[in-house]
Amino acid sequence: MHPAILRLGLAYSDGSVAGGSARADALLAALRRLVADYAVPEGKVLSRDLYAVVNTSIGFLVECRPLSASMGSAVKFVKSQVARSSADLRPAEARGALVALVDAYRAEKVEFALAAVAERAAGYVEEGDVVLTYGHSGAVLASLLEADRRLRRRRRALFG
């Protein structure tokens, strides 16, 4: 088992990585490291063996904590790209292409989506509004930071 997957599983179990976006982002980062560090065993085909390694890793993570919907979509994407990887490419080229695809997926589906939500939600906060939240959400935090950036007069009160 790759060390990044083990660390992520422990973080899921103890709750130190929580929230849908944070968990999906951490999953993609761990899968990226797994792919980047992967070495094809002698006599194996990258797409088949890496697919099995990803399956085993996901099984471990599900045992630590069930996947959210966005995480399930990310796993489907990564597995489909691994299965499609060309046997004609050298292993280093195939790994590089897979890492680039994971990075692009992460940018589009996690980072861009979070920025779009923050942009839209920040528009609902106006001068003089009081916003009280309970708990922590990356999307809510990003929205409030964007609203704070837009407003001229600001007052903040944070409670731990």
Residue ranges of predicted features:
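Short internal beta-strands
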Residues: 154-160
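Short helix-loop-beta connector
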Residues: 125-129, 151
